[in-house]
């Protein structure tokens, strides 16, 4: 049968073999259509299979639910039967419990009735007692009726006193206000008076301050004028001292030259007087120098060296002496001492040991002291209007220092009184005395 079927289509297709090429295009469209149909049917088949599977799953779920419901029905039936049995037993138990509770309630009621009967008796006794006390109080009130009238009178008196107290308080408040107003007025008046007094005192103080300032200014001006005059006087004295010092230095140089000339002449006369058969020439010792003759120490020193050393010492000693003596002892020297010092020192210094270092120092000291004494003499003439007490004290001080000055003058005047010294000791002493002058 199958081969026949296959042969049938092949036989039917044989007559159309010639037109197979022309019908190839429509066959492809049909195949496409069939393919689309096949795909659609496949999808529908898959959908049906899925629905079948879902129905099977739902059927299995329903079977399980049916089994669960049957089990629950069985359990519920057993529970209902057990509950019915429990309810029957519970009814029996509740009836017994209610009977027991009722018996207990009756017993408690009897106890409470007996208790409240006793309390009722006590309260009734208290009520009777309170009624008796109320009757007694009413009787006492009737007895105190006159006191009530007195109380009313006292209350009326208290009200009157309260009104009077209120009136007194008002009056007291008004009085306090008046006193306070008067106090404030007095306070303002006193403050004005005090302010006026303070202002007057301030004006007076300002006037006094201005007057004191003017007086102080005038005093300062007077002091400045006096100090200016003193300064001018001191400047003039300083100029005079410098002029005197220059004159003394010139005299000293002149005396030094004269002394050198005299010594040269004496040496020449000695050579002429000695002759060829005279005594041998004098030679300086090796370790010491004689100090008997004044010219022996000054012979080796040249005039230029003596002149260069002497001015260096004289200003250093004369300047501090003059500056220290002038302001402190302006009116303290006596004219007699000044004249004696001037007469005794200056000539002796001009003729003693001009060429040596020690005489130059003594000469500078003597010159500075002489200048200070001259200045003190001038100061004494200028400040003659000072007080007697100051002049007497300065006179005593000058008289006390007189012997020292005279001894110094005599020592400077007599060269033989000087101790013997070597040239090195003289140089050291000159340097030691020159150092304070530089300081």
Curated annotation (Swiss-Prot):
<feature type="region of interest" description="Disordered">
    <location>
        <begin position="1"/>
        <end position="28"/>
    </location>
</feature>
<feature type="compositionally biased region" description="Polar residues">
    <location>
        <begin position="338"/>
        <end position="365"/>
    </location>
</feature>
<feature type="compositionally biased region" description="Low complexity">
    <location>
        <begin position="376"/>
        <end position="392"/>
    </location>
</feature>
<feature type="coiled-coil region">
    <location>
        <begin position="121"/>
        <end position="213"/>
    </location>
</feature>
<dbReference type="Pfam" id="PF14988">
    <property type="entry name" value="DUF4515"/>
</dbReference>
<feature type="coiled-coil region">
    <location>
        <begin position="27"/>
        <end position="74"/>
    </location>
</feature>
<dbReference type="InterPro" id="IPR032777">
    <property type="entry name" value="DUF4515"/>
</dbReference>
<feature type="compositionally biased region" description="Low complexity">
    <location>
        <begin position="428"/>
        <end position="439"/>
    </location>
</feature>
<protein>
    <recommendedName>
        <fullName>Coiled-coil domain-containing protein 166</fullName>
    </recommendedName>
</protein>
<feature type="region of interest" description="Disordered">
    <location>
        <begin position="276"/>
        <end position="439"/>
    </location>
</feature>
<keyword id="KW-0175">Coiled coil</keyword>
<feature type="compositionally biased region" description="Low complexity">
    <location>
        <begin position="9"/>
        <end position="23"/>
    </location>
</feature>
